[in-house]
Amino acid sequence: MSDNTVKIKKQTIDPTLTLEDVKKQLIEKGKKEGHLSHEEIAEKLQNFDIDSDQMDDFFDQLNDNDISLVNEKDSSDTDEKLNPSDLSAPPGVKINDPVRMYLKEIGRVNLLSAQEEIELAKRIEQGDEVAKSRLAEANLRLVVSIAKRYVGRGMLFLDLIQEGNMGLIKAVEKFDFNKGFKFSTYATWWIRQAITRAIADQARTIRIPVHMVETINKLIRVQRQLLQDLGRDPAPEEIGEEMDLPAEKVREILKIAQEPVSLETPIGEEDDSHLGDFIEDQEAQSPSDHAAYELLKEQLEDVLDTLTDREENVLRLRFGLDDGRTRTLEEVGKVFGVTRERIRQIEAKALRKLRHPSRSKRLKDFMD
């Protein structure tokens, strides 16, 4: 089977094919060879958004055509035996005590024989919750084995296991032993589906809808294929032609597919700087503007000091020089206990004084 395995992994899926097209191809191949590998099915269908009814329909089609499902490592349809290494941490992944305890705990659960699976499935059909729990517990290590393959895609190892367990529960609820498939074969699809869906929903900082993730994956496949064919990066127009999309839509999808970069990303050989240090704050004052503003404040204070206390305070309130809030003549009049007209007169006199060349020349340079 190893030769076939290599051939399968080297095959390029036409990115323009629909879900039904890919399913038909798989069924045709299964008819010729009498079986399909579970890994091949997962690889071909992983980029499509498939609901439970569609997947059950596909399994029914395989059963109707007498196509058996096998493991890629072993073309016989025997029970899958997980190695002790399947319960170890993935390379480069540190696990904490709760995860270590969980892996140790599920390692103590005995695996089921094919006959035991059938007996439990029969009891589950009768609504036996204990049988449902037993079937799920016996396959928890299968979830760990599959979750390890998705490490490094934006989710923690424990989160991958938890999502896979949700898929396992769904498989337990939907498993039909009458179709002739082993439970592990049936459950593997649902575990993979749950994990890949979670990665699409949760792994990104900015969530992208699953249907858009499928479109992005399709675009990436087209992009890679064109890169091989053309020997260069394809233009949006070329990608759009293959996908039957306008170039502007391709650019929009490529923009959505971009991953955000943290402003705390280390920069430099010694990681002593961060990306945010080199990004301009367009809302902040430039150093020259800030310096000019401070000089203006100093000059204005000096000029105001040449007025009487009442004139200075009236201007400060009228123009909001202290707190940025301007006041009406009436509001200022209430502060000083005089009429609006009197405040207007005081203000006019103060402004005339400021317009005198001896004072105005000190502020004129700031008028440009």
Curated annotation (Swiss-Prot):
Give the Basic and acidic residues compositional bias ranges.
71-83
- Name a biological process GO annotation: DNA-templated transcription initiation
Give the region (Sigma-70 factor domain-3) as residue ranges: 214-291
> CDD domains of this UniProt entry?
Sigma70_r4
The region called Disordered is annotated at 69-90
Subunit structure as annotated in this protein's UniProt entry:
Interacts transiently with the RNA polymerase catalytic core formed by RpoA, RpoB, RpoC and RpoZ (2 alpha, 1 beta, 1 beta' and 1 omega subunit) to form the RNA polymerase holoenzyme that can initiate transcription. Interacts (via sigma-70 factor domain 4) with the phage G1 protein gp67; this inhibits rRNA synthesis. Interaction with phage G1 protein gp67 does not inhibit transcription in general, but selectively inhibits transcription from promoters that require interaction of the RNA polymerase alpha subunit with DNA sequences upstream of the -35 promoter element.
Designated name of the protein: RNA polymerase sigma factor SigA
